[in-house]
């Protein structure tokens, strides 16, 4: 991590001892050792012994200097700015937990944050999508030129989002000076750039029943190849294919029922016959196409196949064959090297590791590149996910997860040796690689996530765009403590614990703080230690938070994911309860004032915990599942057989669905709850929240329900985000008996 020459003047006069001392104080011994990848540094936790090692090791000193410069930039960047409070007093005020005044307001989270999404590269430019809550959640593609100029590529009201698989992803790509994208309003594909008329996007497709994603350009044939979902017969019966969409055909005409200009293009079906397709990737010479496919009842992280076909003269595919994968092997992100060698990630050994295809025809096989107990892949909830790419020399630049943290690295193309690239980020997603640089979304523990560009020669990181225009004083930031705790069956599970932090306040003497248990979505998702405004919202008010990576979460290998097979509503709930018990037993939290919250699948875990366990005093379900039978009958195609693996085949296992549905056992409920739901949610229909509310109200327990117009599965609008957070805080205040600081609109709570 050698500092750039222009930055070395910042090191002038700073001794190595001073650097190490300050770094240790900032990061801690273990974290510092991990960041600079020096094992002996961790093993010799004293400054004198570390200095002795560093002075004998120039490359290690370079890493320390680079990290020291980053730390100084972070300190300057995270200094009190827009939302800083006055200097904390020498003696903090004693006040009830939950009532502390916080600089992290719901309005700030809703209005000053954006959702950073897909990244794309073209030459030396970087582009990314950002969802803007203040613009009704509209998604805009922003491009940064080589000279640092930012500009929006899609004009209002165009919203770059595809609803393929409902969760979308892979909604745009760059083609020379053009942007090709899916528009949320009609799900058509558009182009804007040289072919545009008066700067207006031109429609490439015509049917509103089609959805497109994960497109790649076939320049030689003047077309794009994309995944297409045909919803002509409804969401549950959507037909997936790979199609080629011409960029040359058609006549331009002004559309009358949609914004923009319509450009009628022909579409050629290239591959069909599977329930799902993703990740079409064209060999650099255009002669072969690779893609992924899978079928019910599998999800892509359960089992998928990697296909390879030759591209014929007329553009069709011939000799299509499976080269990797199967019903119990998950393949992730096929990519071609610059030399035309197909690479991919597979979990055949229990971990998503990288492979390259060697041999021809029936003799083709996957050669492991760097076997290790780490994840070079992710649960493919969205299109376009990326964990690796190739630099200008053919080396692999990759991001992998190990022990819950991301690490950037380079795999030498000739020796297959893995070399760590030191960065200050604990999560790295959507990695895209150029000739001598890479870009990714990086999350650190003390600052909001950001689009980051890293120079692969100097290893210097540059933040191109932060997810937040506001930053909180680091004195208010609670950093994650990774915990491993015992759970059912003699097993261990993982979580991230956040203690309450607010330098202006302290809780009543001898009283541990209340606890909020967070259960992530998916359930095949993961909690990361990256800075999260929503977590800081609670910790700065006096709550402790534990974000649980229950059995079934990604990032810990296939066996850990498989713990949830047939056990959803059991294993996840056990782990949530046991995480809370572990913290209570060590004295970190008050078990008599504990809540559980979660969204989507995490909302189901929340409702199950409140129904089938008696540990928590209240909970908050954000678009959570209360009726598994209703979900099995009324959902979209992508998840329509998901429950086969989590619960059992439907309807053969109908009895188990009923046994695991909280809606059927409201007589067991003894804890209040608040339910928050979008009225346009297709993944978890609003009828589920209404039914749960009616049942809890009839039971006589305190319950609140907030329905939000225009919201889908996950809240996107600023007003909704703010109202949901404040409503939940108000609810906890009424249940736990504290008055939140500031002015919050009351919530109607039945039976209270």
Task: Give the location of each predicted region.
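Active-site-proximal cap/loop segments of hydrolase catalytic domains
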Residues: 548-752
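Hydrophobic beta-strand positions that form the internal "hydrophobic ladder"
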Residues: 126, 179, 224, 289, ...
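Residue-level detector of Asp-centered blade-edge/turn motifs that repeat once per structural unit
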Residues: 121-123, 174-176, 218-220, 284-285, ...
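Multi-bladed beta-propeller domains
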Residues: 86-115, 145-167, 192-211, 243-278, ...
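Cap/lid segment of the alpha/beta-hydrolase catalytic domain
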Residues: 297, 467-592, 599, 633, ...
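Long, compositionally biased intrinsically disordered regulatory segments in eukaryotic proteins
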Residues: 1-83, 87-88
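A flexible loop/linker signature enriched in serine peptidases of the S9 family
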Residues: 130-140, 160-166, 181-189, 206-212, ...
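Non-catalytic accessory segments flanking enzyme active sites
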Residues: 115-120, 130, 151-152, 213, ...
């Amino acid at each position: 991590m050698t500092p750039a020459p222009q930055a070395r003047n910042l090191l002038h006069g700073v001794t190595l001892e001073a650097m190490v001392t300050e770094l240790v104080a900032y990061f801690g011994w273990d974290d510092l050792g991990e960041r600079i990848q020096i094992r002996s540094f961790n093993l010799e936790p004293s400054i004198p012994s570390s200095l002795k090692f560093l002075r004998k090791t120039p490359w290690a000193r370079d890493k320390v200097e680079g990290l020291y410069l980053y730390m100084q930039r972070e300190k300057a960047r995270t200094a009190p700015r827009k939302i800083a409070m006055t200097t904390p007093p020498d003696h903090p005020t004693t006040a009830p937990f939950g009532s502390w005044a916080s600089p992290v307001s719901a309005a700030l989270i809703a209005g000053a944050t954006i959702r950073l999404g897909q990244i794309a590269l073209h030459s030396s430019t970087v582009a990314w999508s950002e969802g803007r809550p203040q613009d009704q959640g509209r998604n805009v593609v922003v491009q940064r030129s080589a000279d640092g100029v930012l500009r929006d590529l899609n004009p209002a009201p165009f919203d770059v989002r595809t609803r393929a698989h409902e969760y979308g992803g892979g909604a745009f790509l760059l083609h020379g000076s053009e942007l090709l994208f899916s528009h949320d309003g009609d799900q058509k594909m558009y182009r804007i750039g040289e072919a545009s008329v008066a700067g207006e996007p031109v429609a490439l497709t015509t049917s509103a029943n089609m959805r497109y994603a994960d497109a790649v350009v076939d320049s030689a044939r003047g077309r794009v190849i994309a995944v297409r979902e045909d919803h002509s017969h409804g969401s549950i019966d959507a037909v997936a294919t790979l199609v080629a969409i011409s960029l040359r055909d058609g006549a331009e005409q002004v559309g009358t029922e949609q914004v923009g200009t319509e450009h009628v293009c022909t579409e050629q079906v290239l591959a069909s016959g599977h329930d799902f397709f993703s990740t079409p990737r064209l060999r650099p010479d255009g002669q072969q196409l690779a893609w992924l496919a899978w079928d019910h009842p599998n999800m892509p992280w359960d089992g998928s196949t990697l296909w390879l076909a030759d591209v014929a003269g007329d553009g069709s595919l011939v000799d299509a064959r499976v080269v990797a994968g199967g019903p119990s092997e998950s393949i992730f992100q096929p990519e071609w090297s610059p030399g035309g060698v197909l690479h991919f990630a597979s979990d055949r050994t229990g971990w998503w590791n990288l492979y390259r295809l060697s041999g021809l025809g029936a003799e083709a096989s996957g050669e492991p590149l760097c076997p290790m107990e780490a994840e070079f892949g992710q649960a493919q909830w969205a299109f376009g996910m990326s964990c690796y790419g190739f630099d200008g020399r053919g080396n692999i630049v990759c991001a992998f997860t190990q022990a819950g943290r991301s690490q950037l690295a380079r795999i030498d193309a000739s020796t297959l040796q893995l070399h760590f690239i030191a960065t200050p980020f604990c999560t790295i997603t959507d990695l895209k690689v150029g000739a001598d640089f890479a870009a990714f979304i990086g999350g650190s523990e003390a600052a909001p996530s950001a689009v980051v560009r890293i120079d692969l020669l100097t290893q210097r990181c540059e933040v191109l765009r932060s997810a937040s225009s506001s930053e909180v004083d680091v004195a208010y930031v609670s950093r994650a403590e990774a915990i491993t705790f015992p759970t059912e069956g003699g097993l261990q599970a993982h979580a991230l614990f956040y203690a309450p932090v607010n330098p202006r306040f302290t809780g009543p003497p001898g009283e541990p703080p209340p606890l909020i248990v967070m259960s992530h979505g998916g359930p095949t998702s993961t909690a990361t230690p990256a800075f999260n405004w929503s977590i800081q919202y609670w910790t700065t008010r006096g709550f402790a938070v534990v974000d649980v990576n229950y059995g079934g979460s990604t990032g810990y290998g296939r066996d850990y994911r498989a713990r949830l097979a047939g056990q959803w509503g059991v294993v996840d709930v056990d782990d949530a309860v046991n995480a809370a018990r572990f913290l209570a037993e060590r004295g970190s939290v008050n078990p008599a004032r504990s809540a559980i919250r979660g969204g989507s699948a995490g909302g189901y875990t929340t409702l199950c915990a409140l129904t089938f366990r008696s540990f928590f005093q209240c909970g908050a379900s954000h678009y959570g599942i209360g009726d598994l039978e209703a979900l099995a009958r009324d959902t979209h195609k992508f998840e329509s057989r998901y429950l086969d693996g989590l619960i059992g085949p439907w309807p053969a296992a109908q009895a188990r669905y009923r046994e695991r549905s909280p809606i059927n056992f409201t007589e067991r409920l003894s804890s209040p709850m608040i339910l928050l739901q979008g009225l346009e949610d297709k993944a978890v229909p609003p009828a589920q929240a209404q039914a749960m509310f009616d049942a809890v109200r009839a039971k006589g327990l305190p319950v609140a329900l907030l329905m939000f117009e225009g919201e889908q599965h996950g809240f996107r609008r600023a007003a909704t985000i703010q109202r949901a957070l404040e409503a939940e805080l108000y609810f906890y205040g009424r249940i736990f008996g504290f008055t939140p600081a500031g002015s919050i609109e009351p919530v109607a709570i039945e039976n209270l």
